[in-house]
UniProtKB/Swiss-Prot annotation:
Its EC number is 2.7.11.32, 2.7.4.27. This is Putative pyruvate, phosphate dikinase regulatory protein 2. Belongs to the pyruvate, phosphate/water dikinase regulatory protein family. PDRP subfamily. GO terms for molecular function: ADP binding; ATP binding; phosphotransferase activity, phosphate group as acceptor; protein serine/threonine kinase activity. Keywords: Kinase, Nucleotide-binding, Serine/threonine-protein kinase, Transferase. InterPro entries: Kinase-pyrophosphorylase (IPR005177), PPDK_reg (IPR026565). Bifunctional serine/threonine kinase and phosphorylase involved in the regulation of the pyruvate, phosphate dikinase (PPDK) by catalyzing its phosphorylation/dephosphorylation. ADP binds at residues 151-158. The keyword Transferase applies. It catalyses: N(tele)-phospho-L-histidyl/L-threonyl-[pyruvate, phosphate dikinase] + ADP = N(tele)-phospho-L-histidyl/O-phospho-L-threonyl-[pyruvate, phosphate dikinase] + AMP + H(+); N(tele)-phospho-L-histidyl/O-phospho-L-threonyl-[pyruvate, phosphate dikinase] + phosphate + H(+) = N(tele)-phospho-L-histidyl/L-threonyl-[pyruvate, phosphate dikinase] + diphosphate. HAMAP family: PDRP. The keyword Transferase applies.
Amino acid sequence: MSNHLPGVFIVSDSIGETAEMVVRAAASQFNSGNMEIRQVPNISDTETLEEIINQAAASNFIIAYTLVINELADFLKMEARKKGVICVDVLGPVIEAFKSVSDIEPRREPGLLRKVDEMYYRRVEAVEFAVRYDDGKDPRGVMQSDIVLVGVSRTSKTPLSMYLAHKRIKVANVPLVPEVEPPEEIFQVEKGKVIGLVINPEQLNQIRTERLKTLGLKGQASYANLERILEEMEYAQEIMKRLGCPVIDVTNRAVEETASKILEIYYRRLSHV
C-alpha cells in the first residue's frame, strides 16, 4: 500500500472528458497531492489497448475508461485482469442501468455527448448572432449569416431570427425603410440567402397601431398611417425585386409557420450548393 494515489490512464473511444472529470472528482476526496493522469483518446483498436495495459502494469497505474464499443471494453477488462491492472468502467454501469429499466438499446456510438455539447454551443452562438445583427445594427452580419431576412417594420423579422437561432441557424435581419438605403451587402451575398417578408397592409396597420398603444403613443402617428405603410410596402417590394429573392407573406401566420417556410427555402438552397 502507498500513501500516494496511483497514476491513472484515461482511456476513451471519444475524447475522454467524462472519465477525466470523474477521476478528478474522486481524487479530490484524498489529500495526497498531485496525481499523474495520462489521457489516451479516440481508441479504436485492441493493439493500442494492449500497449496501455502493459504500460499501466509496469507503472502501477490504474485505468479509468469510457468505451461504448463492447468489443473494446471486453478486451480491456479481460487483458487488464490477466496483468493485474485495476480497471474502472466509468460509463458502462449507468448505460446498463438505463438498459435494464427500458426497452431502448444503447447506440454504442462514441462521442455523442460531444455532439450534444457542440449543438448546444452552436445554438448559443446563433442566438448571440441574432441579437448582434438584429434590425440592421451591423451590416457585416449579412455576409456572415446563413439567412438574411428583409422587410418593413413589424413583419416578424426579429422573432423569426430568434426562433431560427434556436435551430442553430445564424440569421441577420435588415429593415427596409424608404428614407434609408439598404446596405450594399444584401446585394452581394449569394443568391437565395436573402428572404423577403411581406404582409397585408391592413393587418400591418393594426399591428403598428397596437404597438404604439403599448408604448403610450397615439395611434395616429405616421408609423401606423395606412398611406405610409403602403409607401413602405411598395419600396420594400422594389428592393426585393432588385434582389430577386424569395418572398413570404406573413399575413395571419404564426412565427412557427413562417419559419417552416423559411427553412424549406434554406435547405433547398443548401441541397443545390
